[in-house]
């Protein structure tokens, strides 16, 4: 029985990045031996155990063979006769197929990877030095989720490139229809993780390069090559603009709902009639409609979907909010449900700021609309609605008339703001 540190911890340490989680591989052991040592079994599809003290995961060495379509269509063989190299061979990328014997890892989890101690049969360390994402073996093609994982790693390690042979293999998989077999839960899991990486645009660039974006998110894929007015968008291309917007959301450390809203906000520009280009009148409404199909397809959580819809529908009005009178400003707040959900409205404004700054030459410009609308909301929300409602009732108002009285009071308060 021999234990190794494997995967991301080694990769990140070799890159000089912080190491958080440790994944362990056990070669030459049975489930019974692990249980006898106090390890707790937790794996459903293959033998994985929790350490009795640290609660870190220890997996028995295994091989996998594709035996049926789908995410779970694998035959797993885990036994003491599976070697370290056989286990590493089933992994997706060479940079994730490196191992270090546990005796070189301190009790505090610290370790210094030394070339003489590393098990690196697929030259992952060399690929780290050359900044390459390369598949381990041709078995990569058996799991189409790996297309998404490669794209996600490209977003995390944004100075890495995908090895030409790996990109070619990914293209073959897409052309063979492998991307069509991806289950919604896994697609959303990888997309959401990719959006939260350092440079999310790299994920979509890789997916586009291999053809998977046209399969998974055709609404996004068709934005490339669609022009916008150069006066407002010096980058011109809608696809280029979208990538700048989601990278701005990462730069501003936005939450996942905000980043997804940024990804969805301009979908309608891909359906503008060619004769109307480069203008995109009404694209906000079309964007809000198109994102429903995306969210249904990949089972996007409701709260993330709802924020994206508000941003898609209202971002143009928010950009132009400096031109709006008090009544129009209050109606904008009402449409955004800002009085009931002020925190979500702040997220809406952050997504709009990412949109405004995700343009060539506008990256560092201020976005005064955000602070102004927050001030407008604070003023309108400060209206004593219960007192206004009582006064309206005493004057004989009922039902919708009470709501109209509250609306008028908010408009009056906003109209009194300076500037």
Curated annotation (Swiss-Prot):
Protein name: Multifunctional CCA protein
E.C. designation(s): 2.7.7.72, 3.1.3.-, 3.1.4.-
Required cofactor(s): Mg(2+); Ni(2+)
Sequence ranges assigned to domain HD in this UniProt record: 238-339
Transmembrane regions: none
Binding site for ATP: 8, 11, 91, 149, 152
One BP term from GO: tRNA 3'-terminal CCA addition
Molecular function via GO: ATP binding; CCA tRNA nucleotidyltransferase activity; cyclic-nucleotide phosphodiesterase activity; magnesium ion binding; phosphatase activity; tRNA binding
Organism (species): Variovorax paradoxus (strain S110)
